[in-house]
Amino acid sequence: MAKKSIIARNEKRKKLVEKYAAKREELLKAGDYEALRKLPRDSSATRVKNRCVLTGRGRGVYEKFGLCRQMFRKFALEGKLPGVKKASW
């Protein structure tokens, strides 16, 4: 499981991205790169990491489900993910 501080930092970044999204879009269209540079660094969407909602793991995360590969496999085998079943051919 990821450290709670890492998860909290990512959540803070998500809030900042949401807060400044409209302003950032406006400045990009106007081409005002100087004002864009003065915005908080963490307000950029590229700074947000997709993390597993259960474990906080940052690698191997299925964006559609919000789960890392280990949790995805566990829940899929237990039948807790509707519409997901093990492939066989």
Curated annotation (Swiss-Prot):
The lineage of its organism: Bacteria, Pseudomonadati, Chlorobiota, Chlorobiia, Chlorobiales. SUPFAM superfamilies: Glucocorticoid receptor-like (DNA-binding domain) (SSF57716). InterPro entries: Ribosomal_uS14 (IPR001209), Ribosomal_uS14_bac/plastid (IPR023036), Ribosomal_uS14_CS (IPR018271), Ribosomal_uS14_sf (IPR043140). GO terms for biological process: translation. It comes from the Bacteria. Keywords: Ribonucleoprotein, Ribosomal protein, RNA-binding, rRNA-binding. Binds 16S rRNA, required for the assembly of 30S particles and may also be responsible for determining the conformation of the 16S rRNA at the A site. GO terms for cellular component: cytoplasm; small ribosomal subunit. GO terms for molecular function: rRNA binding; structural constituent of ribosome. It holds the Pfam family Ribosomal_S14. The keyword Thylakoid does not apply. Belongs to the universal ribosomal protein uS14 family. This is Small ribosomal subunit protein uS14. PROSITE patterns: RIBOSOMAL_S14.
